Amino acid sequence: MAEANQPKYYAEEIEKDTRYRQEYVDGANRFLYEQYGKATAQRDQFITPEQYKANPEYYREALKQMLGYPLNLPVETPALTEKTFLAQDGNVNIYRMQFTFFGYLKFYGMYFEQVNAKKDTPFVLSFHGGGGTPEMVSSLHKDSANYVHQTRRMTERGANVFAPQLLLWNVETYGNPHDRLHLDGKMRQLDGSMTALEVYLLMGCISYFIEEGAAPADRIGVVGLSYGGMYALHLAAVDTRIKACYSCSWFNRAFEHSWGDWSYRNAAKLFGSAETAALIAPRALFIAMGDNDNLFDSKVTEEEYARLAPYYQALGAEDQCKLRVFPGLHEQDHEDFGFDFLIEHL
């Protein structure tokens, strides 16, 4: 019979089983990295500069398939639901625009149109990052935080700019509760991803601006920071109407971070950051990363760029692809190299 205050069954201290859990997690990590090494070898066989040069559209379709639904659908030009004039500020008129997809999905952004816009005025999409909004990246909240006036630096260079709202805003700051990873999980069950959905919506917006005469088909560019840099890169890889891309503070090795909404089925065997960026070749691409970025290691950025460069070389387009590691944190470059590169290639 058990004595008072004694457990009914055999018991021991937690420390006795700690080693076993640690050995399990260590083994799981080793297994994953060993498999990643094998997957990288498979990726190197799946796509090479020579294979891409011979059949770029095969790989573009493969990327769309990896990202998933609805990128298998024809691009839909959305209906314009609302266009509200806010102000004339210097050389631009500022509008808030809302579009409707599928008859019910509302998608909005800020549009900056040159006061003296012409048919050949370049058109640029400007993407915010995690926690952001089009208003923030466009300096409408007086400060633009780590975006360093990204949108307005393009309007100052004579471009019409559309800055869309991606499903990334900070709920504590802006309200409108949402759970991106939860929604992405639902998209995965529909053979898609939030990346695929938002790339699809962005492609539809491009179609709208082209049809309205606000975006010349041969002068469309994209710029983005952090998550926005991811969207700039993926949108340009999928949509060849984009002639120049500036991706800042994102280009990295996704496997190291494995954020849920960046982790696609079989991605390690098909498309990493370098291979996704390769689908932009021979179109213009500028990649930037801060040397003291607190999220991504600039040395890994340089390693991934070394994997990317041969694709541009194979197409005789070395001058179309640039990397800049700038002195800074997780922020937009304070210098103008990327912005100048983008406008010069439009």
Predicted regions, residues:
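N-terminal targeting or regulatory segments adjacent to alpha/beta-hydrolase or S9 domains
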Residues: 1-93
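Acidic beta-to-alpha connecting loop that harbors the catalytic carboxylate
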Residues: 29-32, 291-293, 328-329
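Glycine-rich active-site/cofactor-binding loop and its immediate structural neighborhood
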Residues: 84-142
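Cap/lid segment of the alpha/beta-hydrolase catalytic domain
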Residues: 119, 125-207, 211, 257-261
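Flexible loop/turn segments at secondary-structure boundaries
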Residues: 132-134, 169-172, 229-231, 252-258, ...
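Primarily recognizes the serine-hydrolase "nucleophile elbow" in alpha/beta-hydrolase
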Residues: 203-269, 273
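The feature captures the conserved acid-bearing segment of alpha/beta-hydrolase catalytic domains
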Residues: 256-313
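C-terminal catalytic histidine-bearing segment of alpha/beta-hydrolase fold enzymes
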Residues: 306, 312-346
